[in-house]
Amino acid sequence: MCVFNLIALALLLHAQLGSSFILSCYFTNWAQYRPPPTIYMPNDIDPCLCTHLLYAFATIKNNQLSTYEWNDVELYSQFNGLKNKNGNLKTLLSVGGWNFGSTGFSQMVLSPTNRQTFINSVISFLRKYEFDGLDIDWEYPANRGGSPEDKQYYSVFLEEMRAAFEKEAKQTNRARLLMSAAVSAGKDTIDSAYQIPKLGQALDMINVMTYDFHGSWDPMTGECSPLFRGPEDQGGFIYFNVDYAMNYWKSQGAPAEKLIVGFPTYGNTFTLRNPADHGVGAPIAGAGTPGKYTQEAGELAYFEICGFLKDGATEVWNQAQDVPYAYKGNQWVGYDNRKSFQIKVDWLTKSNYGGAMVWTIDMDDYLGTFCNQGKYPLINVLKKGLNLDQHNPWKQLWRQLWRKLQRGHQWHEQRVLRWKEPVLQLQQWRDLLWKMCCWAGL
């Protein structure tokens, strides 16, 4: 069979066999400041790992979308350049975040003029830097210094932005810019912040932050992202689990296929009041010791947790909530591992949710040297569980094509090699096949 037919067949089969699930991964523009060897830049991202990459964070200045870090523009170029290696990859710019708070958003959505100013700046900004969409991380409407009217005006803002994106796409004959939002998983916040059916209509993806259910702000230990309610959960804590949060969003009118389940690649840490009392719900004295690389009290990246375990920490499987925790001395961490990710992604697919969201890509063991589980061990569990790794017999076809190029075979079928004039060089075909192998999940 000629190379042209092989390529055409492989592309067709890939399109037919692809997964419909989304795997969105956040990149943080402060990971560049970590000590070596954990400095993480956009060029370090595997372009074939996730279906959507979200760049955190941009900010709002004078009701306009704006950069935050001094070198964001340079990093944008690296980030969006990843699409040259994976033509199916989508990139979104995320604006806001926990530290940005609520006031800036609240002031922007309050008036039609402010909303229009922001929306116009978004379209211009995203097109200029070649993003495919915007992710709004407002934490949270009508909370943390926001206005009670935020709930209503947030919906109006999203509807207006959706209409503006659709209008711009028609006028320019380009693909419509995508819209996603990071939203709360806490019942009280959900009730006060969101008109869920309207969000479900306007947004393409609803990224539910199903993590940080427990942390050092509580008086006792607890899991960061438990799948189910635990026996210790009483009162308002009965709502603090992934299963309840996702079902609540769905029951209030959010389309299941737009609901994206949040997966943390970190754990929340605690300092025990009594090292001998080290179960779930044990009293604490405060946040856990900062990690060597992330350097933030109360939190450890997954690759740091692997170091904690190697240093002799005891790992316990929390059967009731399908997540692990670990302790050593007066230090305690509730987190996720490959086993809990597998259980959760199986639950996700059976529940017919739209996919998984990862916070963050740079806190997984991306080097593969800390946990000895390969590169990106947690995210790869999701990729496989969502059927995004493309394990199918047609991989052999792609490998055959790649090997031919690696051996330097010269292909002379002019209808394949000629792109106008002159004949494509071998290196160009190698680059093309690299992209095709990426698309096929190789």
Description of each model-found segment:
Residues 2-20, 436:
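Cleavable N-terminal signal peptides of Sec/SRP-targeted secreted and luminal proteins
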Residues 16-126, 152, 158-160, 373-397:
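Glycan-recognition patch characteristic of GH18 chitinases/ENGases
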Residues 26, 95, 214-236, 263-347, ...:
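Glycan-binding loop/region signatures in secreted carbohydrate-active enzymes
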Residues 27-29, 57, 93-97, 138-140, ...:
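A cross-domain feature marking catalytic cores of carbohydrate-active enzymes
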Residues 53, 93, 136, 161, ...:
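Conserved, mostly hydrophobic/aromatic
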Residues 64-73, 141-305:
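Substrate-binding surface in catalytic domains of secreted glycosidases
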Residues 110-134, 157-164, 191-202:
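An active-site-proximal structural segment forming one wall of the substrate-binding cleft
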Residues 418, 422, 426-442:
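Cleavable C-terminal sorting propeptides in eukaryotic secreted/cell-surface proteins
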